[in-house]
């Protein structure tokens, strides 16, 4: 289990999101790559090899790409969790320019070029490079193991620890708070068990495959630990110690608690 991040100021919270947003984006690379292997969208269509897993992965993608927001955040409307996270960053005055620049390069020049962008913090780049190497293996059970053990089963505890430690006030960062709570609920109660089923079905009891899955499990947990530790080191260097519960004007603009349900606006 990665160490608990100590976030004591609004500046540190902003800094955390500016690093972590790349992991949120990286999650979608992993998820969509797994979908491409289990439920390919190409033409001509052929029946999927694992029909039940095709259904599972499509359900997971739908929840991540088009979740319904509650009324208090401007809903009901549909947004991807990535767009929601970006809106949460804007709400607390975090800098979205780096992730926006990387997305622009990815859209026009491809992911490999985007991964070289100097705006990516080094801890985030190392974390994404590891995911990229797993994706390039093209092995469904490798990707499913990374998704299960490095994301779905791990994230609820990570986010719960953040919420318990940071105590986000609803007027302070309601969108970020809802994002964390949503993932704790979805991943803990639904997506985590589905991910475990996916791994089990892909392995089908084969000892060699199970051994590979265990190696991936250890690797992704180790890399998540390293990512969290690197962020912790960066946060320790943040000098703004203004308490989270009392944001002040000199800390910069803190946005509205209502998310604009305009995907194109959120993408800018």
PLM segments and residue spans:
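Non-heme di-metal
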Residues: 1-261, 266
């Amino acid at each position: 289990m990665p160490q608990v991040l100590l976030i004591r100021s609004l500046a540190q919270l902003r800094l955390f999101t500016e690093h972590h947003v790349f992991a949120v984006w990286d999650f979608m690379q992993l998820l969509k790559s797994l979908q491409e292997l289990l439920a390919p969208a190409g033409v001509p269509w052929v029946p999927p090899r694992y029909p039940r897993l095709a259904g599972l992965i499509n359900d997971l993608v739908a929840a991540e790409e088009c979740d319904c927001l509650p009324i208090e955040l401007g809903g009901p409307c549909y947004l991807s969790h990535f767009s929601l996270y970006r809106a949460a960053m804007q709400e607390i005055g975090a800098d979205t320019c780096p992730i926006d620049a990387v997305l622009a390069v990815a859209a026009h020049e491809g992911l490999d070029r985007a991964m070289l962008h100097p705006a990516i913090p080094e801890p985030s780049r190392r974390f994404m490079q590891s995911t990229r190497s797993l994706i390039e293996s093209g092995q469904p059970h490798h990707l499913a193991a990374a998704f299960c053990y490095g994301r779905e089963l791990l994230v609820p505890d990570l986010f719960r620890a953040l919420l318990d430690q940071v105590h986000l006030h609803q007027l302070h960062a309601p969108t970020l708070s809802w994002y964390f709570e949503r993932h704790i609920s979805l991943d803990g109660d639904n997506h985590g068990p589905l991910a475990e089923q996916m791994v089990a079905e892909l392995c089908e009891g084969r000892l060699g495959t199970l051994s590979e899955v265990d190696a991936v499990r250890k690797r992704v947990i180790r890399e998540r630990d390293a990512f969290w530790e690197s962020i912790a080191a960066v946060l320790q260097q943040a000098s703004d110690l203004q308490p989270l519960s009392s944001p002040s004007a000199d800390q910069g603009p803190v946005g509205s608690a209502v998310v604009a349900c305009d995907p194109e606006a959120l993408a800018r």
